[in-house]
């Protein structure tokens, strides 16, 4: 039993010696990657990128404000009127949500989701 331990010990030592160079190259790769990552995200680009994002968000907010349904329509459960041929519903899986009421003489087609 002791002879097997004596044989196993040098084998483990040799395996460890073979693994050391592999671990060293990985540490070098990590050191090479860190400076490159810092170069990509510089402070100058960050400020201009933030300004672009803020401008884009402001545009989106303006569009959302213009599309809002007036409070009194929400309060009384009314749905806004839409024109003939306009999209009147949205399909989400098996459910269909109503976007607007179709004018007289037309109805919301459940296949095309338009006032026909």
From Swiss-Prot:
Keywords: Cleavage on pair of basic residues, Disulfide bond, Neuropeptide, Neurotransmitter, Obesity, Phosphoprotein, Secreted, Signal
Domain of life: Eukaryota
Secretion signal, residue range per the UniProt entry: 1-27
UniProt keyword annotation of Disulfide bond present: yes
Induction comment from the UniProt entry of this chain: By leptin.
Tissues expressed in: Hypothalamus. Found in neurons of the ventrolateral part of the arcuate nucleus, in the external zone of the median eminence, and also found in terminals in the periventricular part of the paraventricular nucleus.
A Pfam family reported for this protein in Swiss-Prot or TrEMBL: CART
BP GO terms, sorted: adult feeding behavior; cell-cell signaling; cellular response to starvation; chemical synaptic transmission; circadian regulation of gene expression; G protein-coupled receptor signaling pathway; intracellular glucose homeostasis; negative regulation of appetite
TM helices/strands, residue ranges: none
Disulfide bond among keywords: yes
In-chain residues carrying the UniProt-annotated modification Phosphotyrosine: 41
GO molecular-function term, one example from the UniProt record: neuropeptide hormone activity
Compartments reported by the entry: Secreted
Its job: Satiety factor closely associated with the actions of leptin and neuropeptide Y; this anorectic peptide inhibits both normal and starvation-induced feeding and completely blocks the feeding response induced by neuropeptide Y and regulated by leptin in the hypothalamus. It promotes neuronal development and survival in vitro.
Family from the record: Belongs to the CART family.
Protein name: Cocaine- and amphetamine-regulated transcript protein
Lineage: Eukaryota, Metazoa, Chordata, Craniata, Vertebrata
